[in-house]
Amino acid sequence: MPTALPDHFFHRDAQVLARDLLGKVIRHKAGDLWLAARIIETEAYYCAEKGSHASLGYTEKRKALFLDGGHIYMYYARGGDSLNFSAEGPGNAVLIKSAFAWTDATSDENALAQMQLNNPDASGAMRPAQRLCAGQTLLCKALGLKVPVWDAKRFDPQKLLVEDVGQTPERIIQTTRLGIPAGRDEHLMYRFVDAGYARFCTRNPLRRGQVEGRDYLFLDQGN
């Protein structure tokens, strides 16, 4: 059995949590398989800034954002499911923006094959393993995570958990979040990417035309 991170791990500042989640592995039990993905991209959100759902106020649908750190907040984005974890402070959370399919003794090649069946490409063909979770809705589709099942729930070590498997990014890229409308704090650098996996995330922050110090920053391990 995998070992789940304790709930108190998530009860920390959203930016700290967003950085600390990089390299951790999400595991979801599907039948007798543990589907798994290594987190490579996260975004932090605060109640006090305009880019967050919580800034729009408390509703029953958003209640997970206002619960203790470690609650699951899921919603629909562009027709697909999205996964967030509540952080310290009411209304603060981390969006799991993308991940990289993970295999080990717990989550083997059969689990990877199931993820590929869950998330074919637009033509119905098998999606390459490195692109299976390259976006927030692709991630949830590959792992089989659904809003009605997991929204406002706690982790269940028998079904859904986040595990520390000893993977720590050597460098982290800090940059602006994606899809934030103009005038809603789109300038805030609350997006964090494992530099070693930058080309596999939602949008590569190191792509041509991006300038270090203007468009992104490098955070060395421990910063």
Curated annotation (Swiss-Prot):
GO BP terms: base-excision repair
CDD domains reported for this sequence: AAG
- This entry's Enzyme Commission designation comes to 3.2.2.-
Report the source organism: Pseudomonas syringae pv. syringae (strain B728a)
- InterPro entries to which the protein is assigned, alphabetical: Formyl_transferase-like_C_sf, MPG, MPG_sf
List, in alphabetical order, the Gene Ontology terms for molecular function in this entry.
alkylbase DNA N-glycosylase activity; DNA binding
Q: Which Gene3D superfamilies match?
A: Methylpurine-DNA glycosylase (MPG)
Protein name in UniProt: Putative 3-methyladenine DNA glycosylase
